[in-house]
């Protein structure tokens, strides 16, 4: 009955722990699996008592005195019947070629697995531990230690005899030993000792902390992290010890090495085993808990923790409760933790079970993320480690992610992820589209559908377009604009739009979309008609892009009404396709539009539309008077008489003045300025432009009885007409506004003219003198005359061949030379001689500068 209660309590606590583990969001660091195959068969009839691990195989000892060699999958490869009682410990050297075994009946065996080498000894007390030298395979290292009531070192002598030496005794049974390099560490009832096999010295003693615990029930756990770091676990205490070299000055009678405890901390549970994992520790803990129902203590599942040692405490990295067979009946001494350094494998050994813990790989990490429904993180992890993952495929994870998002109702995110996950797989795309159709979410996936590489079946795109056409005209129009026309059957969609227009014929969105569909279908005429009806800005682009000028010859007025600027620019840019004559004829009933076209044509080229210049006079007068005068000034083809007639009819004074002056009737023009405009400044400006004395006289005569005009003339006439002529004609007693200022200005202008003349005269005299001096210097220069020069008249050498004969040569400044007798005699009016070639004028540049005689 008590046993049943215990089992019930154990199962209850197990389920509680499992629920807690499920709720935990922290990913485990290790994964676990039972060592099965041959191990399962062994433990059904026997119980495990110890195990040791090599990189190549495992060695398992049992309570019935058997030793089994196993492969890493747990298959039995060899079996040794060592003793009829419990195997206490198995030890292997680093090569895995030699094995040491000790048992409860005092038997010790050390033998070669692949050689006939063997040692047998039976002691009179149980042998609890054995450790062979790590390099036992070497002839110089044939050593091993055993421990019962004392620690013995066995060493083979030169005659192949084994001799033993006592390393330690008197402190109770030796219960644990670990040999690493030249150091042996063991634990007895009092504490932990370390022995240096080279110096034959014991270098430390680390006492145990909790002496209240029975050492046979709570044995010490030892493991070497490296050749100089020993980790000790006993009870709930963990110590990390570092073996260091002692300085020569501190030697005296002390060992050459000493031990320093670099980290020490307490754990929550009793320690059954230790193993290193990089800079962390793996700790197997024996757990006892009190049942809430019965308030009795029971054995709970053992725990495997990864902890980070600190100087005086530790940080828990992960903690897993292990469900091993028969854990309710086990004690702390029944658990062992063995490890394989090469592969970071940890073996949890109990009498009825062997569990293997290993570091989780990327596949395990992805499994955990998928289990926690962290699909996006799982997908990212798979993409980063795609070369290392073996059990997962990126596509499968992605599809699971999409399904998860759909189930959660995140349709837009699911659709967006399809782009990345489905890639170029057309079949998967089509499958997902149908799945979105089934849940009524085609709109969600529509923005992300592939539009090329891959291209899906036309039916897929048509299905989505129909979905939008039924419920969302704007969305439908957007898809038509964005999707290439070759993705779907255009005629099917056109017919569907027409059917909808029968219900709503004035829907601008549908009409515009239909025009775009017509454009894709190259039915440009229908598209243009719709665009013009809608007055859509794309109409000009459509005409240009598809060269539809032949289709718009009868639609020019519509285009001009829509956007006259763009329409005129287009028509003028394409005169070769639609002639000026055709445009003017089409606009005959709309003179205001006709004017806009002809005005822009005139701006571009004054001569192209010359046949319409007469018509333009009336158009400018009617619709655009500000541009009439510039037109009259720039046009050389408009009839002046017609223009004058129109301007006079409309009383356009400025234009009439310009036309009169252009026709040579300046007096009438001036008279109109004076009489119609009463603008003396404009009259003066006009007189200045014409520069005609008679006009000035008329202007003076008209202004003489008008004081304001006289003031204007006095202010502006000074540089064109002598002011005295005006002043003499002013009647005495006439009051003239600002007369004094005007006279002062005249005098100032006169003084300015005098100053300017004097300044100009000075400049002229200075320049003349400078040029005269320059000419004089030039004329004073000598001229070379030699045998190569000829007479320009007779063309014979200028110098005679006989230098003794007398000769006479005339040289001009122009460098022409003549014999004196070849020159004509000077005239009676002027004694000067001139070069016959260069000048016939008096005192020209060819006047003689030198006469040579001999």
From Swiss-Prot:
Gene of this entry:
VPS41
Which organism's genome codes for this protein?
Answer: Homo sapiens (Human)
Q: Write out the ranges of the annotated region (Interaction with ARL8B).
A: 1-540
Q: How does it sit in the membrane?
A: Peripheral membrane protein
Question: Molecular function terms in GO for this entry?
Answer: identical protein binding; microtubule binding; zinc ion binding
Any Pfam family hit: zf-RING_Vps41
Reported impact of residue 791 to F = In SCAR29; decreased protein abundance
Q: Does the keyword Zinc apply?
A: yes
Q: A GO CC term?
A: lysosome
Zn finger (RING-type) start-end: 791-839
What name is this protein filed under? Vacuolar protein sorting-associated protein 41 homolog
């Amino acid at each position: 009955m008590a046993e049943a209660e215990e089992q019930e309590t154990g199962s209850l606590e197990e389920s509680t722990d499992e629920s807690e583990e499920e709720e935990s969001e922290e990913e485990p660091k290790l994964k676990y699996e039972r060592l099965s195959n041959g191990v399962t068969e062994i433990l059904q009839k026997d119980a495990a008592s110890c195990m040791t691990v090599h990189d190549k195989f495992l060695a398992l000892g049992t309570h019935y005195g058997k030793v089994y060699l196993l492969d890493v999958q747990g298959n039995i490869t060899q079996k040794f019947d060592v003793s009829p009682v419990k195997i206490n410990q198995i030890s292997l050297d680093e090569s895995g070629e030699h094995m040491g075994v000790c048992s409860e009946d005092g038997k010790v065996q050390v033998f070669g697995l692949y050689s006939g080498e063997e040692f047998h000894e039976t002691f009179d007390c149980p042998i609890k531990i054995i450790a062979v030298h790590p390099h036992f395979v070497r002839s110089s290292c044939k050593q091993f230690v055993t421990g019962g009531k004392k620690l013995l070192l066995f060493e083979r002598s030169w005659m192949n005899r084994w001799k033993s030496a006592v390393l330690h005794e008197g402190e109770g049974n030796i219960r644990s030993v670990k040999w690493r390099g030249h150091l042996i560490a063991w634990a007895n009832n009092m504490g932990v000792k370390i022995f240096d096999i080279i110096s034959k010295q014991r270098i430390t003693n680390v006492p145990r902390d909790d002496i209240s615990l029975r050492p046979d029930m709570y044995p010490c756990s030892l493991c070497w992290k490296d050749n100089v770091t020993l980790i000790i676990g006993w009870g709930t205490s963990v110590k990390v010890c570092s073996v260091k070299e002692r300085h020569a000055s501190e030697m005296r009678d002390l060992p050459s090495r000493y031990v320093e405890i670099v980290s020490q901390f307490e754990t929550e549970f009793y320690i059954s085993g230790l193993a290193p994992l990089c800079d962390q520790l793996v700790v197997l803990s024996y757990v006892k808990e009190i049942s809430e129902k019965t308030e009795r203590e029971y054995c709970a599942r053992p725990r495997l923790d990864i902890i980070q040692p600190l100087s005086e405490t530790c940080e828990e990295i992960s903690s897993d409760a292990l469900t091993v067979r028969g854990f309710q009946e086990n004690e702390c001494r029944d658990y062992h933790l063995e490890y394989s350094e090469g592969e970071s494998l940890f073996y949890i050994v109990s009498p009825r079970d062997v569990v293997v813990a290993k570091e989780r790989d990327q596949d395990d990490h992805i499994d955990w993320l998928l289990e926690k429904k962290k699909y996006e993180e799982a997908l990212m992890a798979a993409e980063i480690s795609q070369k290392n993952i073996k059990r997962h495929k990126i596509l499968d994870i992605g599809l699971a992610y999409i399904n998860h998002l759909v189930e959660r109702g995140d349709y837009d995110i699911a659709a967006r992820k399809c782009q990345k996950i489905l890639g170029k797989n057309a079949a998967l795309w089509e499958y997902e589209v149908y799945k979105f159709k089934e849940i009524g979410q085609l709109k969600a996936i529509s923005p992300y559908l592939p539009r090329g590489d891959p291209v899906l079946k036309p039916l897929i795109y048509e299905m989505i377009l129909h979905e939008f056409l039924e419920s969302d005209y704007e969305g439908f129009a957007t898809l038509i604009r964005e999707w290439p026309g070759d993705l779907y059957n255009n005629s099917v969609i056109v017919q569907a739009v027409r059917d909808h227009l029968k219900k709503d014929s004035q829907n601008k969105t549908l009409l515009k979309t239909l025009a775009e569909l017509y454009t894709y279908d190259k039915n440009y005429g229908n598209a243009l008609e719709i665009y013009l009806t809608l007055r859509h800005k794309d109409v000009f682009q459509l005409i240009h892009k598809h060269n539809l000028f032949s289709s718009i010859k009868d639609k020019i007025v519509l285009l001009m009404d829509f956007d006259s600027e763009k329409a005129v620019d287009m028509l003028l840019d394409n005169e070769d396709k639609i002639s000026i004559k055709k445009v003017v004829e089409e606009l005959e009933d709309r003179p205001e539009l006709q004017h806009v076209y002809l005005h822009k044509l005139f701006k571009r080229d004054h001569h192209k539309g010359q046949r319409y210049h007469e018509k333009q006079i009336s158009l400018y007068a009617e619709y655009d008077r500000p541009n009439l005068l510039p037109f009259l000034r720039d046009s050389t083809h408009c009839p002046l008489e017609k223009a004058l007639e129109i301007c006079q009819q409309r009383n356009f004074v400025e234009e009439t003045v310009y036309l009169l002056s252009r026709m040579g009737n300046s007096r009438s023009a001036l008279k109109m300025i004076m009489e119609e405009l009463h603008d003396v400044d404009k009259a003066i400006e006009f007189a200045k432009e014409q520069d005609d004395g008679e006009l000035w006289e008329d202007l003076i005569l008209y202004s003489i009885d008008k004081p304001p005009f006289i003031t204007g003339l006095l202010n502006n006439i000074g540089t064109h007409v002598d002011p005295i002529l005006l002043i003499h004609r002013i009647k005495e007693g006439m009051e003239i506004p600002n007369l004094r200022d005007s006279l002062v200005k005249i005098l100032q202008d006169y003084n300015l003219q005098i100053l300017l003349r004097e300044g100009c005269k000075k400049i002229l005299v200075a320049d003349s003198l400078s040029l005269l001096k320059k000419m004089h210097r030039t004329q004073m220069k000598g001229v070379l005359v030699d045998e190569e020069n000829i007479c320009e008249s007779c063309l014979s050498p200028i110098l005679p061949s006989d230098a003794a004969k007398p000769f006479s040569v005339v040289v001009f400044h122009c460098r022409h030379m003549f014999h004196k007798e070849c020159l004509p005699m000077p005239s009676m009016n002027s004694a000067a001689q001139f070069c016959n070639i260069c000048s016939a004028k008096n005192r020209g540049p060819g006047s003689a500068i030198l006469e040579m005689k001999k």
